[in-house]
Amino acid sequence: RTEYLFLSHCHKDHSGAFSRLVSRGFRGWLVAAGATVELARIRYNKVIQADPLSAWPMGLGRDLHFSCGRSGHCVGGLWFHIWDSGKSCFYSGDYQPGPLAFAVDQVKGRRADLAIVDCAHPDTQEDARALRSRILEWIGPCIADGRRVVLPLPRYGRGLELIALIKENFPQAEIAADQGFTAAVEQVCGYGEWLRAGREEQIRAFLEEQPEKRLERDVYDILLLGDTHLEQERCRSLAERELARGGLVIITGRVKPGGFVQTLLDGKKAVRAHFPHHQSMGDFMALLEQNNFQTVVPFHNGRRELYFQAAGTGSKRGLG
């Protein structure tokens, strides 16, 4: 009976269930950015392409409307504001207000009865700049000592952010990457409207350095692997090789329970750093202050909480 399904972006933890929904009978409209549909390789004949650059809300019938904006998380990443004549809902998707590489349309001055808001890092108040500085504190001393840094990453997402971060702070560092990662980076260069000004040129310059050739020649300071959980045998082998040489593996995202990355962390063979590709608790609270959301559900963490706002004040209620 679902008429509309709003998909925020292409990452598997969001798009991966779509085919299952279809197999279970979903025949409604999929609302998503065209880039999301393409990168997630969705084949479906009822798609409404959401345009974050449109100056006008889009009507869906029966007095239902929505507007959207770029979420700063990845190519195709969106937030949605949905309303009808009675109620309204805001959904942040995976949101980051201060990205380096991705364009973001700031969420300010919006009102919603219900808001579902990214709060993936609830244990820190630090903003994106502060969290990025933590990662630099790992990378800098390591490469200064002649040791290599390995960063397992998703193919679409924070890899571009890390390229920008490394280029800005360690311009002389040689970056290598596996072929899967470089192919994905080349693919997203075709979506310039999702990148901040100047970043497409920076990323193309990175590709012209032929990072996969540096990997073949074994000449590099930092290795980017397009395999978040190190599930591919070649990526696991490369990580283990650099660990044996005294290198450092930095985990910047979600850890799959029982996986190889979890084993590395448990054995203190890797370190974990919060990368600001989602919101911290500080970001989350700032977003609430900048908008009028009556009931707020934080997501992307294991907590069960609701936040309520009334007359400029806020309160929190745990759900057990």
Please provide the spans of the model-predicted regions.
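His/Asp/Glu-rich metal-coordinating catalytic cores
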Residues: 1-6, 11-157, 164-174, 200
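Conserved residues at the C-terminal ends of beta-strands
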Residues: 8, 33, 118, 178, ...
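Short, glycine-/Ser/Thr-/acidic-enriched flexible segments
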Residues: 73, 96-97, 121-122, 156, ...
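Binuclear metal-ion centers of metallo-dependent hydrolases, dominated by the metallo-beta-lactamase
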Residues: 128-201, 283-320
